Amino acid sequence: RRQRQMCIRDSNMRTLGSMLPNKQFKIAGETLYIYAPLANRLGLYKIKTELENLSFRYEHPEEYQEIENKLAATATERDKVFKEFTAPIRAQMDKMGLKYRILARVKSIYSIWNKMQTKHVPFEEIYDLLAVRIIFEPRNADEELNDCFDIYVSISKIYKPHPDRLRDWVSHPKANGYQALHVTLMGNNGQWIEVQIRSERMNDVAEQGFAAHWKYKEGGGSEDEGELDKWLRTIKEILDDPQPDAIDFLDTIKLNLFASEIFVFTPK
């Protein structure tokens, strides 16, 4: 039901252009502040990204257009980097005998702008615009985790890994079920590129959220899902009967929403 609500909100955001400017701004802010974090909590990353981008487009139209234009202007160079970077990885994956596909992921417009603001840097100094995603079929279900690390070891022989930027979401899944191994490798041109290693199952969970998570897991209900229900009830209470300090309370709710997703990764 909640995932259907996220899809409805996503569809509604696409029709904002027909509304009055003040209505656009209100809905965009509401979407960015509540619905995008909720989509993230449900593991609906595609919808989360689109909600963020659509909200940003209506709240900051000039900045949105500027970043969109710069992404378009640099697309050819990114495609070239992607092909050159992944060619030896494909050869190595072929040697391993795994069924796989390799995709390019470009940082979203909202994420780029957000990083520009927090890091106080221009677009030209955002160096993680491109990420590479390796999606594979494990040899068998029991080897899924081992296959992730085997791929990591294999591609680390091709490119130098960044020792401080290994994120093991395989052994330590996020609260919304997300699993992947994130590594950062230095390409031949000296550029650091993030590589996300996922099985097809992990990718389904990343794309479809809890719907896919429970499809692969027998039974139902979990502590995390219970926490999500509590968060949703609290949000509903605030929206139904707003208090003078409702905005401050929403800040607290957003913090609590992600509290169970804090991990510390340290190099061995």
Question: Over which residues does each language-model region extend?
Answer:
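Nucleic-acid processing machinery
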Residues: R1-R2, R9-K268
